[in-house]
Amino acid sequence: MMNKNYIKYCSILVMVCTTLAFAQTELNFTNAGATGQNGPTQTQINTAYDGTTLDDDVTINTQGIQEWTVPATGTYTFEVYGAQGGRSYLYGTSSWHDGGKGAKAVADFSLTQGDVLKIMVGQQGVEYARADRGAGGGGGSFVVLSSGTTLLMAAGGGGGAGD
């Protein structure tokens, strides 16, 4: 079974430092529990972010791509994680191989109030219960500055397990 702690961190964390006093806010963008080849819907996002600092601040105009407007000019630290690959049944035993863990990337960016970011959070690869094929790879996670479609960050997903 997939490491439960890794599921919690397969997300995009954005830490905002907007004042000289270094007040910090942490935003945690997730895949909202979406599975398969399509990302989350607006309904899934609304449910996942209800009661959080992202409540009512994220929209989905294209399924799977979250759009968020930068609320204040400042330096933003991004931690971007790719999703883990799916697990696969180990031939001749009653055990499973876990898929590879996704990459992690960290960087700081100066953003301006009103900038719109397009955020895609990878989803875990599909597991495979037969011993003759491998599981699906994890999805990559991406952050794009939508004004010029400039890629700010990317983290690749892990490979799917095989026999």
Located regions from the model:
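Boundary/junction segments of secreted and surface-exposed precursor proteins
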Residues: 21-44
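Extracellular beta-rich ligand/substrate-recognition surface
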Residues: 50-62, 93-101
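Bacterial Sec-dependent N-terminal signal peptides
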Residues: 1-24
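Short, solvent-exposed loop/turn elements at domain surfaces
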Residues: 36-40, 86-90, 161-163
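A short beta-strand element within beta-rich, extracytoplasmic domains
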Residues: 75-84
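Extended, low-complexity, turn-rich repeat/linker tracts enriched in Gly/Pro/Ser/Thr and Asp/Glu
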Residues: 84-89, 125-129
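Extracellular and analogous surface-interaction loops
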Residues: 57-76, 107-115, 143-147
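Secretome/extracellular-domain signature
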Residues: 99-163
